[in-house]
Design a protein with these regions (language model features):
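Mobile, glycine- and charge-enriched loop segments
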Residues: 2-47
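PTP/DSP superfamily signal
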Residues: 2-18, 105-122, 128-130, 135-216
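Amphipathic coiled-coil/heptad-repeat helices and related helical stalk/stem segments
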Residues: 24, 50-52, 107
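Short acidic, glycine/proline-enriched helix-loop-strand junctions
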Residues: 28, 35, 43-45, 74-95, ...
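Glycine-rich, flexible N-terminal cofactor/catalytic loop recognition
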Residues: 33-75
């Protein structure tokens, strides 16, 4: 793939025709631990009964902090009044467009500060836990020193519905952030593209399945 190719079109195309995990809706609100201190899931439900159940499950898993990266809704007041979890809202739209490097800066700086305390457990979610949340988690893992493909593999292993389409933006941000030159940026992006080509998911199927079976 040339450096001038449309990376996001490539990812969305490769994610549109391949693997379909069984019962993806069962993963929507599942607590998926990437490390003992870093988790992913789907966003807090707008149904208060379901939302209270989610918060109870999160607290049982040790979650102390929650970064919500979905723009659709802000449940900060509900979380504050129904749990002891600290809520941080860093929502962005899931429009398939390029992620602003400043967003990755904000997510990772917030996460790293939280994770300085070894007793903290951080939850990161978007709404479905398919793209924005896993991509933000991927950026945090890079900032923690993880190798790029290992981070992608671990995210997919613990959350099989994680398409993580903004991972190319994340790795580009990270290489530049750490002083990499244009050649290093191209190499890192190509490695992420290759990983997605070798590990495709049917993103459209996942989103339809979760939405139609849960009312998301």
């Amino acid at each position: 793939m040339s450096s001038k190719s449309n990376v996001r079109s490539f990812l969305q195309s490769s994610l549109g025709h391949q693997n379909r995990p069984a019962n993806p809706e069962q993963w929507w609100h599942a607590v998926c631990k990437v490390t003992p201190n870093l988790c992913m899931s789907g966003g807090i439900s707008n149904n208060n009964v379901t939302a209270r159940k989610q918060l109870s499950e999160w607290e049982a898993a040790g979650v102390t902090h929650y970064i919500a990266v979905h723009e659709e809704c802000n449940r900060g007041h509900f979380v504050a009044t129904n749990s002891n979890i600290e809520y941080i809202y860093l929502g962005v739209d899931d429009d398939g467009g390029k992620r602003d490097p400043k967003w990755f800066d904000e997510v990772t700086s917030t996460a790293l500060k939280i994770l300085e305390d070894p007793n903290s457990v951080l939850m990161i979610t978007c709404w479905m836990g398919v793209n924005r949340g896993p991509s933000a988690t991927y950026a945090v893992l890079l900032a923690l020193g993880w190798e790029s493909q290992r981070a992608l593999h671990e995210i997919r292993t613990v959350r099989p519905i994680a398409c993580t389409i903004y991972s190319v933006d994340a790795v580009k941000w990270w290489v530049k952030r750490t002083g990499g030159d244009s050649q290093q940026v191209r190499k890192a992006c190509a490695e992420v593209e290759q990983w997605h080509a070798e590990n495709p998911l049917d993103m459209n199927y996942l989103i339809r399945a979760i939405g139609s079976r849960t009312g998301a």
